[in-house]
Amino acid sequence: MTIAREAHIVDLVDQSGASVGEATVGAAHTAPGRLHRAFSVFLRDPANGSLLLQQRAAVKTRFPLRWANTCCGHPLPGEDVEVAAGRRLAEELGVAGVAFTRVGVHTYRAEDPATGRVEYEYDHVLLGDLPAGVQPVPDPAEVAETRWVSLSALLDGFSADPEPYSPWLFGVTACLAEHLAQPHLPRPNAGRFDAPERSGGR
């Protein structure tokens, strides 16, 4: 499944997020990397504000077994980011019907020292609340483990030892922390999406 996903198409972008072309997942993540559109989802428990983290499966071609946000992926060229995020969340964790809020964009480049593969992403950060009565059911081909953490505990974890975490997690968490500290800001592009066909993840 991971190998097949390398052939999926991603949206190449410039530093402002404007589309400039297309490439396969495999080509976009081959050194030195090509900047492309991605998303990072945080799923929140509305009862206590905790956030769901996932440990990436061992078969991932980039940063396997690192802890990351709830799920990540790439929209298809021209596809709405929230639509792709809703599909990916359902694929990896069995959670559908989530309303997303865009909380920021994190652009970063990171090379996996073990595989030489590169993440170079214009990463839309999304926040959604876990629907009432729903329990995540991780796909073991995508997710090794999950855990719920508070935002403060996650930030403390970065300070204590950043090694177990994916290289993008600090940046996307900083976007989320800034958003949550400013609840008066507008929340554009929120939407509700259910789960259809499979899409490209990362």
Predicted regions and their residues:
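Acidic, metal-coordinating catalytic segment for phosphate/diphosphate chemistry
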Residues: 2-40, 44-48
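Residues that flank catalytic or metal-binding motifs in active/ligand-binding sites
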Residues: 8, 37-39, 71, 102, ...
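Nudix hydrolase/Nudix homology domain
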Residues: 27, 65, 71, 104-113, ...
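A glycine-rich, hydrophobic loop/mini-helix early in the fold
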Residues: 38-74
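The catalytic Nudix box helix
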Residues: 52-53, 70-103
